[in-house]
């Protein structure tokens, strides 16, 4: 016997979270909980403002329609990426397809004073991989900060993310301030320039490896082995169903590319599922899931070791 609940939620964000020039004051989303007999599966649907094509309200309408169809015996999935991902996760939990084993390691997202970062990163146990957002300030400053971190910590590797912020000139200004001897320890730089051709040229000219992120969600993108392209970053909330995520991971791995499963600032429930997906599909690769600290609370399932308060399901607004 099938049954389902849908919950709507809103989590206050820490001050200072800015996405594509807009301040994100709250993270808004939905949960779906599917039941079939004794089995239960959860999924999170939380379109990311400025990145997802669908709004929270559109996702809610699509989810409620899909849940009602599922209760009537339908086996299809919604079209909207965030809804398809959340629904497919709930089904994967319900059927036991999604393994329980999780990779709760996360490449720390580095913000703040560079001198403080050096101290923090130097004390990191094990493999030292960290992420730095670039393109928010002057390219020269970004280059100097990256160079400082790599110089101060000889075993540090950095993942950088520019979100297509730079013109070719700005990208070259960044590279100019990174010692060529350190560039191999830039694991990759996500989407440095506004176009893929400019990003490819940057990789060729500087020897700094790049990764595709936004490009994966463009209609003309195909997986190819290319000079200077080392990785792809997959954000499942923006991608679609779990099957589509698996297809992209397989296509990238077949070309020898590194695949990083990455957060779209999901709640703790969504992040714990992404940790399981990473352990399952990209074992041995550190996922990019260090975003929980941007929020003021957890929900339903806590992230191991987090001190943030965790709301129970009965504290959420139920829609169905």
Swiss-Prot record:
Residues spanning the signal sequence: none
Keywords: Lyase, Magnesium, Menaquinone biosynthesis, Metal-binding
Biological pathway: Quinol/quinone metabolism; 1,4-dihydroxy-2-naphthoate biosynthesis; 1,4-dihydroxy-2-naphthoate from chorismate: step 4/7; Quinol/quinone metabolism; menaquinone biosynthesis
Record GO terms (molecular function): magnesium ion binding; O-succinylbenzoate synthase activity
KW ATP-binding (keyword) present: no
Enzyme Commission identifier(s): 4.2.1.113
Similarity comment: Belongs to the mandelate racemase/muconate lactonizing enzyme family. MenC type 1 subfamily.
NCBIfam families: menC_gam_Gplu, PRK05105.1
This protein's name: o-succinylbenzoate synthase
